Design a protein with these regions (language model features):
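A short, proline-enriched helix->beta-strand linker immediately N-terminal to the Walker B motif
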Residues: 171-175
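Hydrophobic anchor residue at the start of the ABC signature
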Residues: 114, 166, 186
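Catalytic Walker B motif of ABC-type/P-loop ATPase nucleotide-binding domains
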Residues: 177-180
Length: 186
């Protein structure tokens, strides 16, 4: 099985009040195509930091990579410029974030937030993106999905917001889906 993701000796640290601390210490693992891998550990063990490192979504420069390589399809993501990472994020690699209440924009409708991802990465017109958004919301179990298109996040339950986040992550049929406690609110 070919390696889709290969992480080698990843160490991640944070700086706070001039003091450095290590959150992830030389973690290595790989994920093959079609494979499911779970990172298991107690709270604070670095699971989320490891996941966020893959897409360089940590709060840089407070966060820093002390060592390691992150290869996605044999390309070292750690050395890629931001514009390249933007083309990967939400398209080839998607992430279901742990906290849907703060991950959705409170000012935009569910339709806008999901369809925008589809339009941006797939180049579809709004009507086609809207139809795909409706299909995705139905697929993840949103009741009365058509009515929910115009809803703002605060009008949905926590579980429904989590389902919207799952729909967003699946929207572009990513090669790799990272799920950081995806069922927290379900």
């Amino acid at each position: 099985m070919s390696k889709l993701l290969n992480i080698e000796a990843l160490s991640v640290g944070f700086v706070s009040d001039g003091q450095k601390s290590t959150a992830v210490n030389k973690v290595s693992f790989h994920i093959g195509r079609g494979e499911t891998v779970g990172l298991v550990g107690e709270s604070g063990s670095g699971k989320s930091v490891s996941a966020l490192s893959i897409l360089k979504l940590l709060p840089y420069p407070t966060a820093f990579h002390e060592s390691g390589k992150i290869y996605f399809n044999d390309v070292d993501l750690m050395t890629q410029p931001d514009h390249m990472l933007r083309s990967v994020r939400g398209n080839r690699i998607s992430m279901i974030f742990q906290e849907p209440m703060s991950s959705l924009n409170p000012l935009h409708s569910i339709e806008k937030q999901v369809s925008e991802i589809i339009e941006m990465h797939q180049g579809l017109d709004h009507a086609t993106a809207r139809a795909e958004t409706l299909r995705l919301l139905t697929r993840v179990g949103i009741p009365n999905a058509e009515k929910r298109l115009k809803a703002l996040p605060h009008e949905l339950s926590g579980g429904q917001r989590q389902r919207v986040m799952i729909a967003m992550a699946l929207a572009n049929q990513p090669d790799l889906l990272i799920a950081d406690e995806p069922t927290t609110a379900l």
